[in-house]
């Protein structure tokens, strides 16, 4: 585990560290996307990584249903949705928990959700909730605003009922299980690539933007926050090691450019 007390400018990322990178983990909302849409420079950056033979896996709190079209259409190896519980690889879907566990957890979560909506009158479920299979989500900044006190109360209710709770840039997510973004990364890296993530950690970089990325910032020596992470800086116990000059999708593209520019230029053979 790393313990970063300050964020260094992306330009200070050592070239030898960048050259070791063979895989990228990234958040989606407000990291790859800007105002809910992936900008051209971020999509182009994904294509560049694919062409360079660098694995790209998105890890998000978004639901499996919301993520499915992007898993098919974007140049990604996989999307791990619902904070590590569901993996989408092209048209295929994999679950971390078995069907019985998921069904039991759905019943428990529905009761917690009813409590939240009763105790916090301003709370609203996220508009993407229909596509959720293993968690619940309360909107705090995407289509509906919750103040800090209401957010804290929602988190408290989830945790009081034995749930894991995280706050992203747009939602409060809660679920039953010990999984998180890091466990999801370990799971899919082994399942899809046959690689032991912890034995190969210096070959990966994580890119994120908010408090629910902290477990990744804490674990990865190579971690980058896009510039809009400054909004959450005071709330972060673990900072990313580096920060981009630009926000959101443009910042993601800057990380990719930094990686690719560090690679040795192939010498033509006669």
What are these regions, as identified by a protein language model?
Residues 1-26, 270:
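Non-catalytic pre-domain segments flanking phosphatase-related domains
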């Amino acid at each position: 585990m790393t313990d970063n007390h300050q964020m260094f400018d992306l330009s200070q990322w050592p070239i030898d560290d960048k050259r070791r990178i063979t895989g990228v983990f990234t958040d989606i909302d407000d990291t790859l996307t800007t105002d809910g849409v992936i900008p051209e420079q971020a999509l182009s950056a994904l294509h560049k990584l694919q062409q360079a033979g660098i694995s790209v896996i998105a890890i998000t709190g978004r639901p499996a249903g919301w993520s499915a079209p992007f898993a098919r259409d974007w140049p990604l190896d996989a999307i791990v949705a619902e904070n590590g519980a569901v993996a989408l690889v092209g048209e295929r879907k994999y679950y971390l928990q078995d069907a019985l566990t998921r069904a039991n957890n759905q019943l428990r979560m529905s009761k917690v959700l009813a409590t939240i909506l009763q105790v916090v009158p301003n709370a609203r479920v996220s508009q993407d909730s229909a596509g959720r299979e293993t968690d619940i989500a309360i909107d705090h900044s995407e289509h509906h605003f919750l103040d800090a006190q209401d957010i804290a109360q929602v988190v408290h209710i989830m945790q009081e009922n034995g749930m894991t709770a995280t706050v992203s840039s747009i939602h409060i997510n809660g679920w039953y299980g010990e999984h998180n973004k890091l466990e999801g990364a370990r799971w899919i890296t082994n399942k899809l690539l046959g690689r032991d993530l912890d034995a190969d950690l210096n070959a990966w970089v994580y890119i994120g933007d908010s408090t629910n990325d902290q477990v990744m910032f804490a674990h990865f020596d190579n971690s980058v926050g896009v510039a809009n992470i400054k909004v959450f800086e005071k709330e972060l116990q673990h900072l990313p090691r580096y920060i981009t000059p630009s926000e959101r999708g443009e910042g993601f593209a800057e990380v990719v450019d930094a990686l690719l520019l560090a690679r040795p230029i192939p010498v033509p053979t006669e």
